[in-house]
Amino acid sequence: MAGAAPTTAFGQAVIGPPGSGKTTYCLGMSEFLRALGRRVAVVNLDPANDGLPYECAVDVGELVGLGDVMDALRLGPNGGLLYCMEYLEANLDWLRAKLEPLRGHYFLFDCPGQVELCTHHTALRSIFSQMAQWDLRLTAVHLVDSHYCTDPAKFISVLCTSLATMLHVELPHINLLSKMDLIEHYGKLAFNLDYYTEVLDLSYLLEHLASDPFFRRYRQLNEKLVQLVEDYSLVSFIPLNIQDKDSIQRVLQAVDKANGYCFGVQEQRSLEAMMSAAMGADFHFSSTLGIQEKYLAPSEQTAEQEAMQL
């Protein structure tokens, strides 16, 4: 009906391994969204997340507590968390009752960090699937720490995990390299930043691994993993510094395009702004180059560039 209030809600499912900056991202993104004029509701789906730095609209801890589960069932932290998510999956009426009064808000779901929840366990995927039935359009925002770029073996592992997550979660998906402002603290990059964000020819990573006697033994395995990632050709990354509003804006543009928010009726945009979102302000090369110049010292060379001069 033409005059009916919109019922579709939008949001982000913030996922990623422990320590990748999910909670900090939710805090920074919620502040940025409020500055844009959006009504934001942050939902904590991690029962192990204590001392939340943001105002929490819904907290799964009100339904089930990790400590209580561990004590009652004699489970460890990982097993207890899986039980909590299965319990939430079995009690989605509780979650729906909490979310329904917030209809009209933009949702940020702060999810648990256990990797298996996003790669093969079904509870979280089922929860997201049910939210879609409630007309809640989510984008999965997968954070990984940028320091993995400094180690070829770890970066291949991140690529495989990111690919598995994209295939399993079944949501519109973007991957972020978080903590870009700290990337120099982790060591030199072997290649320019765009090599990692665009996931370019991965054979060069194999050559770096071959120089290590330990990884040389697993060359065939690494070749197959790299081939798998390249065959799907799905994984790419957006660099993020949560303290930089330009960086947050680039991420938000990608999220809005993924879940369709930028073409919705809740936020009126000028034609110029809509075209910017549609065309993507994202000629990624120029934006990534600017980020590299900002966070990597100009005088520094990549490890690959140094090797070529020897």
Curated annotation (Swiss-Prot):
Keywords: Acetylation, GTP-binding, Hydrolase, Nucleotide-binding
InterPro entries: Gpn (IPR004130), Gpn2 (IPR030231), P-loop_NTPase (IPR027417)
Positions bearing N-acetylalanine: 2
Entry binding sites for GTP: 19-24, 178-181
Gene3D superfamilies referenced in this protein's UniProt entry, alphabetically: P-loop containing nucleotide triphosphate hydrolases
Keyword Acetylation applies: yes
GO molecular-function terms, A-Z: GTP binding; hydrolase activity
Site feature location: Stabilizes the phosphate intermediate: 78
Motif Gly-Pro-Asn (GPN)-loop boundaries: 76-78
Subunit structure: Heterodimers with GPN1 or GPN3. Binds to RNA polymerase II (RNAPII).
Family (UniProt): Belongs to the GPN-loop GTPase family.
Function: Small GTPase required for proper localization of RNA polymerase II and III (RNAPII and RNAPIII). May act at an RNAP assembly step prior to nuclear import.
PANTHER family: GPN-LOOP GTPASE 2, XPA-BINDING PROTEIN 1-RELATED
Protein name: GPN-loop GTPase 2
Source species of the chain: Mus musculus (Mouse)
Gene: Gpn2
